[in-house]
Design a protein with these regions (language model features):
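Cytosolic-side membrane-insertion boundary helix
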Residues: 10-13, 17, 254-292, 302, ...
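Hydrophobic alpha-helical transmembrane signal-anchor segments
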Residues: 12-40
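Alpha-helical transmembrane segments forming the membrane-embedded cores
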Residues: 6, 279, 283, 287, ...
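OB-fold and OB-like beta-barrel modules that bind single-stranded nucleic acids
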Residues: 73-80, 310
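N-terminal Lys/Arg-rich, disordered targeting/topogenic segments
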Residues: 1-12, 369
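Alpha-helical transmembrane signal-anchor/signal-peptide segments
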Residues: 37-62
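Short, solvent-exposed beta-strand/turn "edge" segments of beta-rich domains on protein surfaces
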Residues: 62-73, 91-94
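Soluble non-transmembrane domains of integral membrane proteins
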Residues: 78-247
Length: 369
C-alpha cells in the first residue's frame, strides 16, 4: 500500500533552512577575513621584498667591513665548520653545520568541537613531535599518554659555523634548504633498545621504537636524523657586526634569503617573489569557494519562499548553481577590491568592474529564467 506523506509545513522548511543560513554567514565571514588577511599579507611581503632589494649591497665574505654594519648585504661563499657534532644517544658523529634528531611519538590527541551548545570531545591517535600530557585531557584515564620519552628531539648547531669571516647563527643555518638525511644503517639498534627499553628496528632510513611498525601503539617512537653539511651558499641579510640576521623591512616583514650554491642577488629575490604569488593565489581560490558556498547556502532560504513568491521561484529553481557561482565570484571581486583599495590603484578598479559585470549578468539571467 502506498501512503502519501503530508507535505512539509512552511514553518518546518524555514526551520530546516536556518542551519544553512547560519552556515552561509559563517562561510562569508570567514572568506572576508581571509581575503583581507591574505591581500594585506601578500602586499606587505612584496613591499618588504622590494624595500630589501633596493638596499642590497654586494660584499665579500672576508674581511668584515664595519662600515656596512646594519646594512642589507649580499654575499656568497663556502659555509664551513671545523668542529664535529655528535648524537650520543645514537652514537653518530658528523662534520656539519647542524645536526637534527627528530623524534615523533604516537600518542592520544584531543579535539574539542565547540560548534554545538555543549562542547564535545573527540580522541584519536597520531604522530607528533611534542608529547601531550594526558592530564590536560578532559578524560585522562581513558586516554593515557606516556609520562616521558626515553629519547627526545635534539637540534645542534656548530658554534664556529662561518661564511668567510661572518659567523652564521642558527637562524641562517635553518634557512639553508639543502639538508640531507643521515645514514642510520650503522646505528647499534641493540644498544638503543637497551637504553630505551623498546624494541628497535630500521625502517627505510628511520629508526622505529616499538613492537610493530605496521601497527603502531601509543608510546611508539620514530626517529629521523638530518644534517646541514658544509656547502656553498648565497645570502641576502642584514649585517650585524660580524654576523648576519633577518632584515626588518619598514613594510613590516622580516626578510632573510638563503639559497644553496652560487645564486645571484637578483635570482634570490626573484625566487622569493615567485613563491609569494603561489600562496596568495591558493588562498584566493579557497576564498572564492567559500564565497560561492556561502551564497549557495544563503540562497536556500529563498527555497522556503519559492512556492509563495514568484520572483524567488525564478531565481532558485532552474539556475541556482549558476546564480550562486556568479554571485559568489562577484562578491569575492567586491570584497577583494575593498581589501586592496588602500594598497593599490588599478587592481581594485578592475575587480570592481568584474563585480559590476557579474551583477549585470545576474539581472540578465534572472529575466531569462
Amino acid at each position: 500500500m502506498v501512503q502519501d506523506l503530508p507535505a512539509q509545513s512552511w514553518g518546518s522548511r524555514l526551520k530546516d533552512t536556518l542551519a544553512c543560513l547560519a552556515g552561509g554567514f559563517v562561510c562569508l565571514g570567514l572568506a572576508s577575513y581571509l581575503i583581507f588577511w591574505n591581500e594585506k599579507t601578500g602586499y606587505r611581503y612584496d613591499s618588504s621584498l622590494e624595500q630589501t632589494e633596493s638596499l642590497v649591497i654586494a660584499v665579500p665574505d672576508k674581511p668584515v667591513n664595519n662600515d656596512n654594519n646594519q646594512s642589507v648585504v649580499y654575499l656568497t661563499g663556502e659555509a664551513l665548520t671545523n668542529r664535529s657534532l655528535s648524537d650520543l644517544q645514537l652514537n653518530i658523529t658528523v662534520s656539519a653545520l647542524a645536526l637534527k634528531r627528530q623524534v615523533l611519538v604516537y600518542e592520544w590527541l584531543e579535539e574539542i568541537d565547540n560548534d554545538k551548545a555543549k562542547p564535545h570531545y573527540h580522541y584519536y591517535t597520531g604522530w607528533r613531535e611534542k608529547l601531550i600530557p594526558s592530564s590536560s585531557f578532559l578524560d585522562p584515564n581513558s586516554h593515557p599518554n606516556p609520562a616521558s620519552l626515553p629519547i627526545e628531539s635534539l637540534y645542534q648547531y656548530a658554534e664556529d659555523a662561518a661564511l668567510g669571516d661572518f659567523v652564521l647563527p642558527s637562524t641562517v643555518i635553518d634557512a639553508i634548504p639543502d639538508a640531507a638525511k643521515v645514514d642510520l644503517s650503522k646505528v647499534d639498534l641493540q644498544s638503543l633498545q637497551t637504553k630505551t627499553g623498546k624494541q628497535a628496528a630500521l625502517v627505510g632510513n628511520e629508526i622505529y621504537l616499538g613492537a610493530n611498525p605496521k601497527a603502531p601503539q601509543v608510546g611508539d617512537l620514530r626517529i629521523r636524523v638530518t644534517a646541514v653539511f658544509p656547502q656553498k651558499i648565497s645570502i641576502i641579510a642584514q649585517q650585524n657586526g660580524n654576523t648576519l640576521q633577518a632584515y626588518q623591512a619598514p613594510a613590516g616583514d622580516s626578510i632573510l634569503l638563503v639559497a644553496s650554491g652560487e645564486v645571484s642577488q637578483h635570482s634570490l629575490v626573484d625566487d622569493a617573489r615567485e613563491r609569494s604569488p603561489a600562496v596568495v593565489w591558493f588562498v584566493r581560490f579557497i576564498c572564492v569557494l567559500l564565497c560561492i558556498t556561502g551564497v549557495s547556502l544563503l540562497m536556500r532560504i529563498m527555497m522556503v519562499f519559492a512556492d509563495k513568491i514568484k520572483l524567488a521561484h525564478k531565481v532558485t529553481r532552474p539556475g541556482a548553481s549558476l546564480v550562486s557561482s556568479i554571485a559568489g565570484l562577484s562578491l569575492w571581486c567586491l570584497i577583494t577590491a575593498i581589501a586592496l583599495a588602500p594598497l593599490q590603484t588599478m587592481m581594485p578598479i578592475i575587480l570592481l568592474a568584474f563585480a559590476i559585470a557579474g551583477v549585470y549578468l545576474l539581472t540578465r539571467l534572472h529575466f531569462k529564467v
